[in-house]
Amino acid sequence: MLMLLRRRCRAWLEIRRLDKELAQSSGLPLELPQIVPNAWNEVVWRLPVPNHPDAFMTASNAAQSDFIVYVNGLAFYRAWLALGVEDSQACPLKQDMPKDRKYPSSAAHFAVGIDSPVPLADVSPTMILGHFAVCFTDGMTRSMWLLAHEVAVFPVLSRDEASAVMLAEHVGVAAPIQVSKLREQCRKI
């Protein structure tokens, strides 16, 4: 019980810190990840990673009807923390993310680079006690890796338009875009 109380307190303090940081950075422009041409004829993004080689992600796991949402890393982290510490998908604090048992596997996948881009996380919005939060169908550890490495903006996958719009409103940096339209744009690159 005491351990759970400590986790709640640490998460609450982190949310407060993030609220201040997000308020201070409000209105500052964030760059979208760059889409790069590739041999697979699929959408692949180059994500700048501070003090590390760039990371590469792909929409190869997306259906044509799915949507891509570019999320602000800090806002996304805050929304994931809002899920609560008791939830099975609870967000660890950034400093604890590398301790996750699957983290080394995600790190290894990101380390391969452009030759094997990492699939996007499949994310859904939810409300917890009146607060916006995010939950996952797939990609929690990939998201931990991005957050632990301070990636400012990254794409996530959303399976329907209403969810994509809600994600974009709360944690997004641009309007959502349907995968079919994005793939069409990529063919023109």
Swiss-Prot record:
Does this entry carry the keyword Endoplasmic reticulum?
no
InterPro entries xrefs? FiwA/Osa (IPR035615), PFIN (IPR054044)
Keywords for this protein: Plasmid
Q: What does this protein do?
A: Suppression of A.tumefaciens oncogenicity.
Identification of the protein by name:
Protein osa
Its encoding gene is what? osa
